[in-house]
Amino acid sequence: MTIEKRIDIYVFICMKEFPLISVVTVSYNAIATIEQTILSVINQKYSAIEYIIIDGGSTDGTVDIIKKYEDKISYWVSERDNGIYDAMNKGIRHATGKIVGIINSDDWYEMDAFATVADLYLKKGDLYLYHGDIRYCLGKQETRVDSPNLNLSDFYKGSCVFHPTVFVPLAVYRKVGVFDTAYKIAGDYDFLLRCYLNSIKFMYINRIIANMRI
């Protein structure tokens, strides 16, 4: 067997064992925070990452920061959009990974988030939506909030899954659709409810996945 053939087999095994995770960041005039977001993605303890940034036409220097890391970014664009959910949908349309995470430009991931999600995905597959705990950050004050397993009554009480912690198999988007752009602030809640009503199971991860500034 040639060296080239052995390398091809090794690459195939790696791709099979480590599913590609697509990550979408949407941004607009986020110069103060987006660099931390980007670093939390590209410095993950996991290498099979496709990183997509959809910027809404920032004018404050955000694009300069994106360009600083564009060798680590699979796709990015800066153009006007029709709101946050339109931007998220643009990112999803460019995603080719098995799983998609969405993180806004003022939030950031824990360094082991992707490895944790990928490990569960390999065990559970495409019929689950993966989510975990979040850390709220207000200045120096930090609060961990959990998001345990859900039932339908939880949805009627309001949003009960923290969107920055959510990872959705691309197959789920194909089944239930993407975000409804008719919503201005509740599109993520609508999407999660559609998942639940379409028998997508929610897999809770008992650890902090992401951090959110409040």
Question: Model features per residue range: what roles?
Answer:
Residues E4, D8-I214:
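Nucleotide-sugar donor-binding/catalytic module of glycosyltransferases
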